[in-house]
């Protein structure tokens, strides 16, 4: 339910932003008949909107291009990025990541697995602990699964997981499988660096409209990461 609520809230935000822009354009169109400054302001706003849409389109293509699983590249470890936990059970988003991780691990029985994510509000256990319990209950040997329970966001997921792997002799130049939602892979892989090997978790078909919402939201997150980081 949290996944659906977040998607609906973001859609509402986009709706109000679009309504505000259309209102301003309407006012400028009205005043442009008698006031030259309004004509120039309207042209400037339209130019900015066109540039913004073009930038968004490029980012969206970039995000979509990473939503795939690379089965061919050999890796030295697997990192599963956390998502919400409902009490002690994985949320829909986290469940899809765990399913993708389990499927990827089937043919790679010797790889270490880092599960990363702290305990958030409304969660009875950490995201890492939830993933550990889920994977080990489905046959993954406990000694293969390394918990990282401090990370609160994607940047920390990457930083703390790299530190754990470094302690195991897996360095910056090593190839590591990054398991996360398809829409999230572009940003996560960009933060990880050249060694990132994508493993995409996909939503069930009935959640396709919500998935579109999340792909749109991720393009804005990528823009923020590029501009402010």
Placement of each model-derived feature along the sequence:
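A structural signal for short, hydrophobic/glycine-enriched beta-strand patches
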Residues: 58-216
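Structural signature of transmembrane alpha-helix termini at the membrane-water interface
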Residues: 24-31, 54-65, 223-227
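A transmembrane-helix-recognition feature enriched in membrane-embedded lipid enzymes
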Residues: 211-229
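Internal/C-terminal transmembrane anchor helices
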Residues: 39-61
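Juxtamembrane loop-transmembrane helix junctions in multi-pass integral membrane proteins
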Residues: 3-6, 33-43
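Membrane-embedded alpha-helical segments of integral membrane proteins
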Residues: 1-31
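Acidic, low-complexity intrinsically disordered regions
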Residues: 12, 33-36, 58
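Generic intrinsically disordered, low-complexity segments enriched for polar/acidic and small residues
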Residues: 2, 7-13, 53, 101, ...
């Amino acid at each position: 339910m949290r996944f659906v609520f977040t998607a609906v809230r973001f859609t509402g935000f986009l709706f109000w932003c679009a309504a505000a822009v259309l209102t301003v354009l309407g006012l400028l169109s009205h005043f442009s008949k008698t006031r030259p400054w309004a004509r120039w302001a309207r042209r400037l706003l339209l130019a900015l909107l066109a540039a913004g849409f073009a930038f968004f389109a490029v980012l969206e293509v970039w995000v979509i291009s990473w939503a795939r699983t690379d089965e061919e590249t050999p890796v030295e470890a697997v990192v599963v990025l956390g998502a919400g936990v409902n009490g002690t059970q994985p949320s829909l988003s986290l469940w899809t990541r765990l399913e993708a991780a389990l499927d990827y691990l089937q043919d790679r029985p010797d790889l270490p697995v880092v599960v990363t994510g702290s305990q958030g509000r409304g969660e009875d256990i950490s995201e890492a602990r939830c993933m550990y319990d889920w994977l080990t209950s489905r046959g993954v040997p406990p000694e293969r699964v390394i918990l990282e329970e401090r990370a609160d966001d994607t940047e920390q997921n990457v930083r703390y997981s790299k530190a754990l792997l470094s302690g195991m002799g897996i360095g910056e130049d090593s190839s590591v499988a990054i398991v996360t939602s398809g829409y999230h892979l572009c940003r996560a892989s960009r933060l990880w660096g050249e060694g990132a090997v994508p493993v995409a978790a996909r939503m069930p078909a009935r959640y396709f409209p919500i998935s579109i919402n999340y792909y749109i939201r991720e393009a804005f997150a990528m823009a923020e990461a590029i501009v402010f980081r």
